[in-house]
Each structure stands twice: as C-alpha cells, then as structure tokens.
Amino acid sequence: MKTTSRKAEIIAEASQLFKEKGYSAVTVRDIAQAMGIKAASLYNHIEGKQEILSVLILDLAKEFTSGMNAILKMNNSPLQKIEKLIELHIDITVNQSEALAALNNDWMHMAETDVNNFVVMRETYEENFRTIIKEGIAQGQLQPRHPEVILFSILSTLRTLYLWYQKRGKLDVNLLKRDMVAVLIRGIV
C-alpha cells in the first residue's frame, strides 16, 4: 500500500514538473530532487519517466471516457448532454490541470502502445461528442452549423481552459460552469 502511495506522490510531483518545464525537459533526477530523494530510489516505485507520463495521460483519458459514457446513458436532451460535457471538462480542469498539460502537450512521448490506446480513446470521445451535436442539430436544439466547427470551437476552448484558469486564480467553480456553459452554448443555440 505504501508503494502505491509513494508512486502517486511521484506521479503528482512529476506532473507539476511536466507542466512547468515540459516532459522532454524534465529528467528523473529532477523528479527525485523535487521529492528530496535519490534518483535511483525512484526506480523502486516506477520504471521510468515514460511510465509516469503514460499513467498521467491514460488515467485522465479514462476519466474523460467514463464521464462521456455516464452522460451518454443519461435520458437528457443533446443540449443538456453538451452542458454536462462542458461541466465535466471544467471539473477535470479544476482538479487535474497538471495532468491536462501533459495530455495536451506530451501524449506523443508515451510508448507506442499507450499512444495508440490514447488516440482510440480520444477519437471515440470526439465521435461521441460529434454524435450528440448532430442529434442536437437534427432535433432543432442547435443551429444548423457544421458539426465539426461546433466541436472544434467547444473542445478548443475546453482543452486550453487549464492555462487560463490557473492564471486567473481561484474562480468559483459553479460560477465558472454557469458562465462557460452560457458562453459556449449561446454561440450554437
């Protein structure tokens, strides 16, 4: 149990360093130094820097996938599902901004198998989001705009929210959700 806890501490420290410096610029020695231990000691808990990156990104991708699956099962309108997806992104941003930085910027540095798994999860997520948008258009809940433009506009904003949110200090999460949903939806309703 202690090993798992220590591994989680290592991953948390590394994710902060990855966000600050970028994955490529961070060494195992940097991670160890930030934790106040010797680099060799890290290998008792992890295989290497790439494993940390994979755990960060794949765990986050699974969280997005799980959230999407829960939203798809809801008996809500497409518009309500889009609102829930925006809220999902905000919740993840507020709680895991460091991991989001790695997911957005460093996913291509994972092992090939992990990259492939990530790409499948990302493409499935985007396809589900696209389907919800198309249903909203077909039901007249959304303006008849190109679904790709709507998807790109929403996801581009949400994927970079972690950069903006950190710079603005602690905003009330409920206020952020209310305003972000209103701003993004008004442009497509």
Predicted features and spans:
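Amphipathic alpha-helical packing segments from all-alpha helical-bundle domains
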Residues: 62-65, 69, 113-139, 148-152
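C-terminal peripheral helix-coil segments that are non-catalytic and often amphipathic
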Residues: 91, 127-135, 156-157, 163, ...
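Short hydrophobic clusters on alpha-helical segments that form packing/core surfaces
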Residues: 10-18, 89, 184
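N-terminal intrinsically disordered/low-complexity leader segments
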Residues: 1-5, 145
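Amphipathic alpha-helical segments used for helix-helix packing
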Residues: 94-113
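Helix-turn-helix
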Residues: 9, 17-51, 55
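All-alpha amphipathic helical-bundle segments outside canonical DNA-binding/catalytic cores
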Residues: 80-83, 119-121, 137-153, 171-178
